[in-house]
Amino acid sequence: MIRITEAAQEHFAKLLANQEPGTQIRVFVINPGTPNAECGVSYCPPDAVEANDRKLDFEQLSAYVDEISAPFLDDAEIDFVTDQLGSQLTLKAPNAKMRKVADDAPLIERVEYILQSQINPQLAGHGGRVSLMEITDEGYAILQFGGGCNGCSMVDYTLKEGIEKELLQRFPELKGVRDLTEHQRGDHSYY
C-alpha cells in the first residue's frame, strides 16, 4: 500500500522521539477521489487510533491509515530527500485523486485513470489539463485540452510525442489520439 523509504523512516523516528510514548504517524487523504485531493501526514498518539484504522508496520515506526483514505493511498511513497537546497519530506500518491481501476475495467475507464493520475499532474505544472471526451468505435481517444494547454504552441508535440505515445504503449487496442479543442491563443496559454 504505502512505501516509506529508510530516509523517511529515520526522519520520522527522530520526530517521534520527542512525542508522547507510543505516538506513531497517520497518513491520510482529504477529499479523496476528487481533483482537490490532498495528502498529509500527522502525529498519531495512542488515543487517536480508531478501531477501523489500518496499521502498517515499518522497521522504525508504524503508520495508521483510515479506511476511507486507504484505497487512495495504493502505490503511495513517502521519502525524505536531501539536495543542495536542503531537505524535504515528499509524499507521492498517484491514486489520491482517482481510485486505481482494475486491469479488466472498460478501456475508457483505464484511459481516464491514466490521464488523471499520470498525464494531468505533468500538465498541471504549466496550468494545463486534458480531458477524455470519448473513445471512437475506430479506437481513437478524443481529447480536449484546457487551461495553459489551450492555444499553447507546443500542444501538437505534447499530444503526439507525450500523450499518444504513453497511451499507445499502455493500451495497444487504441489506434491513436485526436484533439478536439478549438485552440485560442491568449494570456492563459503556456507557450
Curated annotation (Swiss-Prot):
Bound cofactor: record note: Binds 1 [4Fe-4S] cluster per subunit. The cluster is presumably bound at the interface of two monomers.
Disulfide bond sites: none
Example of a GO biological process term: iron-sulfur cluster assembly
InterPro entries registered for this protein in UniProt: Fe/S_biogenesis_protein_NfuA, FeS_biogenesis, FSCA_dom_sf, HesB-like_dom_sf, NIF_FeS_clus_asmbl_NifU_C
Protein residues bound to [4Fe-4S] cluster: C149, C152
Cofactor(s) needed by this chain: [4Fe-4S] cluster
Alphabetized UniProt keyword annotations: 4Fe-4S, Iron, Iron-sulfur, Metal-binding
Pfam families named among the record's database cross-references: Fe-S_biosyn, NifU
Top-level taxon of origin: Bacteria
NCBIfam families per UniProt: PRK11190.1, YhgI_GntY
Family: Belongs to the NfuA family.
Reported function: Involved in iron-sulfur cluster biogenesis. Binds a 4Fe-4S cluster, can transfer this cluster to apoproteins, and thereby intervenes in the maturation of Fe/S proteins. Could also act as a scaffold/chaperone for damaged Fe/S proteins.
Protein name: Fe/S biogenesis protein NfuA
Organism: Edwardsiella ictaluri (strain 93-146)
Top-level taxonomy: Bacteria, Pseudomonadati, Pseudomonadota, Gammaproteobacteria, Enterobacterales
